[in-house]
């Protein structure tokens, strides 16, 4: 079990200041089947990128060389990534009728201010008028609050301001059975200093700090 721990991740940062997070989407899971490519699963892909990529461009190019296979039958996922240069992107696997068909088209969404945050619905323009994209309410309130907070500070937040924004969108477990219905941890990444601060289960008075030696 200990040997598997490096692959049991939902976000992370590496020594080059590249960071990635994965968030749940509704609909069918991604199942790419290009015979010329090897297949990776969600967390294996994240481990690979944190181990091998230094920038967002390197990470997206690397992902494109593999089939993505997401193992849950009732959910898919999208990735948010950023690096120490200030570059950021969202990677989604899209397609028509994702409520009944497995999405297979990898889309990389770059350098657009509307794409500086994600929650639990597709943000790709190709998914705009779909049940799990533009018409979805899953995570919509959190997304709107994140957008408003980012705009308020012109997308330039201090670590303390970023944490205050995370407090605004944090959710309690009361009455929720969804894995996206309550906040298990909140993290602020400093990609230039290669540091992060973490609060678990909304215990804002208990902060854990981690750094990476270069």
Annotate the PLM regions.
Residues 1-7, 11-51, 74-77, 82-214:
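C-terminal, well-structured catalytic/ligand-binding subdomain of enzymes
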Residues 46-70:
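Short N-terminal edge-element motif at the start of the domain
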């Amino acid at each position: 079990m200990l040997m598997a721990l490096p692959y049991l991740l939902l976000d992370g940062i590496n020594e080059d200041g590249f960071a990635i997070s994965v968030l749940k989407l509704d609909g069918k899971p991604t199942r790419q089947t290009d015979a010329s490519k090897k297949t990776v699963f969600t967390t294996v892909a994240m481990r690979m990128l944190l181990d091998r990529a230094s920038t967002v461009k390197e990470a997206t190019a690397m992902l494109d060389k593999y089939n993505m296979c997401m193992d849950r039958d009732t959910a898919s996922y999208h990735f948010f990534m950023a690096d120490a240069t200030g570059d950021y992107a969202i990677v989604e696997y899209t397609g028509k009728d994702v409520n009944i068909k497995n999405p297979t088209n990898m889309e990389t969404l770059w350098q657009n201010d509307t794409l500086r945050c994600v929650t639990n619905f597709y943000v790709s323009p190709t998914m705009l008028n779909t049940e799990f994209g533009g018409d979805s309410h899953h995570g919509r309130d959190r997304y709107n609050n994140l957008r408003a907070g980012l705009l308020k500070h012109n997308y330039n937040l201090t670590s303390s301001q970023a944490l205050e924004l995370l407090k605004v969108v944090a959710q309690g477990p009361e009455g929720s059975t969804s894995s996206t219905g309550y906040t298990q941890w909140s993290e602020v990444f400093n990609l230039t200093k290669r540091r992060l601060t973490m609060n678990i289960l909304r215990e804002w008075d208990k902060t854990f700090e981690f750094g990476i030696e270069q």
